[in-house]
């Protein structure tokens, strides 16, 4: 930031806290909302770091109590980092750590390592839950520079099936159900669960869940896809806490040809949204992606007004006509008005875009210097943002479709 640099966080609580600070700092340089495209993938390293720290501390404590050969904390920390790739208490990972400790001269029983592992896992889960609680509470209380609104935040998640990513998702959902004080439902962050065939969905899993839904809710069914149980938990959370919303990555317009389930960076090819409305994916000037991009401007069309004007004009043109003739004429007038208005809006948005390009990079120090906007990191402070914004979108929206139909047809 312009006030100093921040070191890489070393615990899940620090990861979550810095995520809120990033939201707030970025909010102060823009209008509207912002979104993290792969929250589970980004928070997962914090879970693993927390687990390794607890594993290190508990092993040191055990060796200190029992006496005998032990290692310096820095040595043991490095050993754990090298031999513990996951929080999952699988035989391979536990065996690797046990063998490495014995090779270093640390006398510790295999069963002791398993107990320590379970204890470190439980402690990490509790801290992850607290981190997600803090994340939610902070985003519903900390204000942006405007002072009259909390930071408008969104997080997308659902496709990280690593044990660490799954823990983040599960504890975020749990903290969302718990809510704020006095049972208040948290409004922020807006949450979007990404549903993907082979990751969190399959027809086989759906059939198994429907067959015995009570067992599915209780987590007593082993599903084929790794995150189908989290999809069920997400649906349960939505039923009581409004969020998450759901994004279906297999819809034809949401697919990316480069997405592969074995790619650790697959989240780069997943569409993400801001809130319940802003989808940025296709790109006229580069690869389609939601990363480092956003909506630059939007203008909404007032459909009821156009419909009312169309009915009045049609009535004047056919003063003695029946309602069907008037409606037919009004429909044509209305559709032509929509075309003309959309063209005018496009011209207005482009004119504004040309002005937006003249802004200087130093007006957005955090956003540009950290490459939050794709390409912003290459700019000097007094450079115009210019082509950095060409990856953004211009939005033509509308409001009142139902009311417009009532105005023309007398019914919705």
Tell me what each language-model feature is.
Residues 1-391, 407, 411-412:
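Conserved catalytic cores of very large enzyme subunits
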Residues 394-407:
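Contiguous, well-ordered alpha-helical segments that form the cores/surfaces of helical PPI scaffolds
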């Amino acid at each position: 930031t312009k006030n100093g640099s921040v070191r890489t966080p070393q615990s899940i609580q620090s990861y979550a806290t810095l995520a809120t600070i990033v939201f707030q700092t970025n909010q102060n340089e823009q209008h509207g909302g912002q979104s993290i495209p792969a929250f589970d993938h980004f928070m997962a390293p914090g879970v693993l770091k927390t687990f390794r720290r607890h594993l290190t501390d508990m092993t040191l404590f055990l060796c200190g109590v029992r006496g005998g050969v032990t290692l310096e904390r820095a040595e043991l920390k490095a050993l754990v980092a090298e031999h513990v790739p996951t929080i999952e208490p699988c035989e391979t990972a536990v065996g690797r750590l046990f063998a490495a400790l014995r090779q270093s001269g640390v006398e510790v029983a295999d069963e002791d390592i398993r107990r320590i592992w379970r204890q470190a896992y439980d402690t990490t889960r509790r801290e992850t839950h607290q981190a997600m609680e803090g994340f939610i509470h902070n985003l519903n209380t900390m204000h942006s520079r405007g002072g009259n609104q909390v930071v408008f935040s969104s997080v997308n998640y659902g496709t990280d099936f690593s044990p660490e990513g799954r823990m983040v998702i599960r504890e975020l959902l749990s903290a969302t159900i718990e809510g704020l004080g006095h049972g208040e439902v948290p409004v922020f962050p807006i949450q979007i669960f990404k549903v993907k065939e082979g990751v969190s969905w399959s027809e086989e899993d759906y059939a198994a869940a429907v067959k015995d839904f009570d067992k599915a809710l209780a987590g007593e069914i082993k599903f084929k896809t790794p995150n189908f149980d989290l999809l069920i938990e997400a649906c349960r959370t939505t039923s009581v806490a409004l969020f998450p919303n759901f994004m279906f990555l297999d819809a034809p317009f949401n697919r990316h040809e480069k997405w592969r389930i074995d790619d650790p960076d697959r989240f780069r090819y997943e569409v993400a949204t801001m809130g319940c409305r802003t989808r940025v994916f296709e790109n006229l000037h580069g690869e389609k992606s939601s990363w480092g991009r956003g909506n630059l401007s939007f203008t909404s069309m007032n459909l009821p007004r156009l419909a009312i004007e169309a009915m009045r004009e049609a009535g004047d043109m056919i003063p003695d006509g029946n309602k069907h003739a008037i409606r037919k004429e009004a429909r044509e007038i209305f559709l032509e008005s929509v075309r003309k208005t959309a063209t005018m809006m496009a011209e207005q948005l482009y004119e504004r875009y040309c002005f937006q390009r003249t802004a200087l990079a130093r007006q957005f120090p955090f956003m540009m210097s950290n490459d939050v906007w794709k390409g912003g990191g290459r700019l000097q402070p007094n450079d115009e943002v210019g082509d950095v914004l060409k990856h953004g979108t211009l939005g033509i929206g509308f409001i009142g479709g139902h009311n417009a139909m009532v105005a023309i047809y007398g019914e919705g």
